[in-house]
From Swiss-Prot:
Effect noted on mutating R312G: Reduces catalytic activity by 20%
Gene Ontology BP annotations: phosphocreatine biosynthetic process; phosphorylation
InterPro entries: ATP-guanido_PTrfase, ATP-guanido_PTrfase_AS, ATP-guanido_PTrfase_cat, ATP-guanido_PTrfase_N, ATP-guanido_PTrfase_N_sf, Gln_synth/guanido_kin_cat_dom
Subcellular compartments: Cytoplasm
Family from the record: Belongs to the ATP:guanido phosphotransferase family.
Gene Ontology cellular component list: cytoplasm; extracellular space
SUPFAM superfamilies xref list: Glutamine synthetase/guanido kinase, Guanido kinase N-terminal domain
Domain Phosphagen kinase N-terminal: 9-91
Keywords: ATP-binding, Cytoplasm, Kinase, Nucleotide-binding, Transferase
Listed name of the protein: Arginine kinase
Domain annotation Phosphagen kinase C-terminal: ranges: 119-356
Length: 357
């Protein structure tokens, strides 16, 4: 059973959400009294409670979603809350739906999105992975962080050819290395307030680190928001090359480290928005005519299931007219379909930009 102190915090949090009339999060929308009462006393095998799930959304009433999964089991234990939120966010994922098996597809059908180099500054494809047998951030101990870092860094040190590189632990990092990684926009900072309040930043910087290849086109973040964020990126719009590099890397890592996978939700992640393929294919792009009004840009993008963010990602503004545009759907479709959705949408948006007066 859940202890009284936690229950009191849960009741107070529920009341706060109910009274926050300007809160538009999916948490507030779907955490009804019935749902709340049905799961407030539950606990996972690793000790996670509903408070671990909702505390970030209770603290940050401006959250879009407002919940995180403290461990893999939470998706089932707190299903009455996760299920409707996942269905809502991913544009329809019913209780009977299942995420399809991994399918990278025919890489040769992908193209360079902007061969003339007029619009796209860079292209990036990333996916998140969790290591089997470990909980997610809020439930990890300092020892587990170290153990995971050891497993991952030794796996990455065996990367070959284009993927060969160096692992830089955040613990004890020299100022010079730190500055270089900041200049390259590679260094992740301790989490923002959404992650902080989800308890995703405990024992920082223990167990956290960054691996990148010599060409700086392949990158792995270790124990940031997810256990692993595997990233392929480069300047320009050559999506085919970027995607192919990611596929090679993920398959390579997966052959050595078992990932946390669920028959219904696909690959499991800390945030329910990333479930399934966990894949986010994005471009940094300038579309000055379409972007005269960000709202218009967002409306156009959403027609293609694309999402617009500021230059430096979520919760940021555009700098110099550069936007980050990516696929929104990650669940209920294959990796190939997700990357195709981004490709086809961006090609259409470039066409519209060229045609605009």
């Amino acid at each position: 059973m859940v202890d009284q102190a936690t229950l009191d915090k849960l009741e107070a949090g529920f009341k706060k959400l109910q009274e926050a009339s300007d809160c538009k999060s999916l948490l507030k929308k779907h955490l009804t009294k019935d749902v709340f009462d049905s799961i407030k006393n539950k606990k996972t095998g690793m000790g996670a409670t509903l408070l671990d799930v909702i505390q970030s959304g209770v603290e940050n009433l401006d959250s879009g979603v407002g919940i995180y999964a403290p461990d893999a089991e939470s998706y089932r234990t707190f299903g009455p809350l996760f299920d409707p939120i996942i269905d809502d966010y991913h544009g329809g994922f019913k209780l009977t739906d299942k995420h399809p098996p991994k399918e990278w597809g025919d890489i040769n059908t992908l193209v360079d999105l902007d061969p003339g180099g007029q619009f796209i500054i860079s292209t990036r494809v990333r996916c998140g992975r969790s290591l089997q047998g470990y909980p997610f951030n809020p439930c990890l101990t300092a020892e587990q962080y170290k153990e995971m870092e050891e497993k991952v860094s030794s796996t990455l040190s065996s990367m070959e050819d284009e993927l060969k590189g160096t692992y830089y632990p955040l613990t004890g990092m020299s100022k010079a290395t730190q500055q270089q990684l900041i200049d390259d926009h590679f260094l992740f900072k301790e989490g923002d307030r959404f992650l902080q309040t989800a308890n995703a930043c405990r024992y920082w910087p223990t167990g956290r680190g960054i691996f990148h290849n010599d060409a700086k086109t392949f990158l792995v973040w270790v124990n940031e928001e997810d256990h692993l964020r595997i990233i392929s990126m480069q300047k320009g719009g050559d999506l085919k090359t970027v995607y192919k590099r990611l596929v090679t890397a993920v398959d390579n890592i997966e052959s050595k480290l078992p990932f946390s996978h669920d028959d219904r939700f696909g690959f499991l992640t800390f945030c329910p928005t990333n479930l399934g393929t966990t894949m986010r294919a994005s471009v940094h792009i300038q579309l000055p005519k379409l972007a005269k009004d960000r709202k218009v840009l967002e409306d156009i993008a959403s027609k293609f299931n694309l999402q617009v963010r500021g230059t430096r990602g979520e919760h940021t503004e555009s700098e110099g007219g550069v936007y980050d545009i990516s696929n929104k759907r990650r669940l209920g479709l294959t990796e190939y379909q997700a990357v195709r959705e981004m490709q086809d949408g961006i090609l259409e948006m470039i066409k519209m930009e060229k045609a605009a007066a």
